[in-house]
Structures are given as structure tokens and as C-alpha cells.
Design a protein with these regions (language model features):
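Outer-membrane beta-barrel proteins
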Residues: 1-261
Length: 261
């Protein structure tokens, strides 16, 4: 039989007539717009729209060669979270409570290339009851953007992703926050019954504390992989590397096996 929903439980409702889709509740309302591919190893520096599932409302409808989705996120809380993404470094500004409002949209379609673009932003209205004294002037805002493009060339697929996000806050009179930008480029090609791929990526992040911006932390990633089917089993071998500009490097070599029926 049916069980009642427990405290903290979530649900989602989806309604569609084939041309317009409405979503209400805890769902993946917006795409990360990621189109690149990766292998089994670590090393890739993700470049995408930093959004996730959230309890909100969205409408998706056909526009030209693709689909446009518009989403709204409205909730009260004490964490710097909007459109499903938490900016933990800015929780200090929202800890006394407030009303958070976020808006975002995504367009995905075939425009001669497989394209997806997501943009979103959000901010908090600080609680007058909970945020008193120095906290009465607290503020926080978030913005995010992601672009993904994939192009088939013969049997190969070339894909490119670009993403940025910024979380800025004020606590009393002190400003802080973080900003990140990155890109990914991948190429996947058939090799007989197998496939091979390469992914190159880079991210740069800047953190601001007390109104003073720090140096950019830049990390470059490389991943190579080869995947071959062996009956119902797929075997992948790869190499991954993540190098920071200060000279530290993390390297990983390994293999992964998966089975499908």
C-alpha cells in the first residue's frame, strides 16, 4: 500500500501536452549544458553550468530548432543555495536567514551543432527578524552560465564546454566570495569496434576575503582513454592528470570494467 510522506520528503509533478512541459517540485529543472565526454580516470576539470535539482517550478516549450526551459526557485533558508547549487563560502552571509529567489533558463537544440546554453542568477533578501545588528546589511548573490557544443565529424565527435559561476556576499561591511571559470575540449573517435578519446580542460578560481581578491588558482586537466567491448563486457583503460600552476600534479592510470545485458 501507499506510505505517507515523511518530514523532509520531496516530490515532483510533471505535466505535458507534448508541446509544453510543466514541472513542479524537486526536479532537475535546468541542464548543466555539458556536452564533452570523459573516461574512467580523474583529471578532468568540469566546465559546466553549476546547477542541480531543486524544489521549484519550470516551463519547457519548443522554440525554433530546440527547447527553451525557464525555471524559478523561491525558498527560505540559512544557506547560500540557489538553483540547487550551494556556495558554502557564502553561508556566513545567509546564516541568519532570509528569502532566496533564483531564476534561470536553458536552450537546447540542433542549430547545425548540438548546442545547450544555461544561465541563472539568484539573491537573498535578509530576514529582518533574524539578521540584526551588523548582520542587518548582509547580502548575497549568485550567477552561473554554461555553454556546451558538440559537432559530429565523420565518425568522430568534437565537443566544447565553457562555464562560469560567481558567488559574492557582504557580511557587515566586509565583502567576500568566489568566482570560477573553465573550459573543456573533448574528442571521441571509433577505432574498429572500440573507441578512443581525449579530454583537455582548465579552470581558474579566485577567492575574495575582506574585500581583497586572492591570486587565481589555475588547474589544467588531461585525460586519455580507450574503451573496447568484449562480449557483454566493456573494458576501459585510461590516463588522467591534473596539474596546478604552482607545480603540484596528480596523475592516475587505471582501468574500468562494466557489464551490460
Amino acid at each position: 500500500g501507499a506510505s505517507p510522506m515523511t518530514a523532509g520528503g520531496t516530490a515532483a509533478i510533471t505535466l505535458t501536452d507534448g508541446s509544453i512541459t510543466y514541472k513542479l517540485g524537486d526536479a532537475g529543472h535546468l541542464s548543466t549544458a555539458e556536452k564533452t565526454s570523459g573516461g574512467p580516470m580523474a583529471g578532468i576539470q568540469d566546465a559546466e553550468a553549476s546547477v542541480d535539482s531543486f524544489n521549484g517550478f519550470s516551463v519547457g516549450l519548443g522554440v525554433g530548432p530546440g527547447t527553451l526551459t525557464v525555471a524559478l526557485d523561491m525558498h527560505a533558508g540559512t544557506t547560500a543555495t540557489v538553483l540547487g547549487e550551494n556556495s558554502a563560502g557564502s553561508d556566513i552571509a545567509t546564516g541568519c536567514g532570509g528569502q532566496i529567489t533564483g531564476f534561470g533558463f536553458n536552450f537546447a537544440g540542433d542549430v547545425g551543432a548540438d548546442l545547450s546554453f544555461t544561465y541563472g542568477s539568484g539573491s537573498t533578501t535578509i530576514s529582518a527578524a533574524g539578521c540584526t545588528g551588523d548582520n542587518a546589511t548582509n547580502a548575497w548573490g549568485y550567477s552561473v552560465m554554461g555553454l556546451g557544443v558538440a559537432v559530429p565529424v565523420g565518425g568522430m565527435t568534437i565537443a566544447f564546454d565553457f562555464g562560469t559561476k560567481a558567488s559574492l556576499h557582504t557580511v557587515g561591511t566586509a565583502e567576500g566570495g568566489s568566482a570560477t571559470a573553465g573550459w573543456e575540449l573533448s574528442l571521441v573517435m571509433p577505432v574498429g569496434d572500440a573507441s578512443a578519446g581525449v579530454n583537455l580542460s582548465s579552470t581558474a578560481a579566485i577567492t575574495t576575503t575582506g574585500g581583497v581578491a586572492g591570486d587565481a588558482a589555475v588547474t589544467g586537466g588531461t585525460e586519455l582513454w580507450y574503451t573496447v567491448p568484449i562480449g557483454p563486457v566493456s573494458l576501459s583503460a585510461g590516463y588522467g592528470s591534473a596539474a596546478v600552476v604552482d607545480g603540484s600534479t596528480t596523475t592516475e592510470i587505471g582501468a574500468e570494467m562494466s557489464m551490460s545485458f
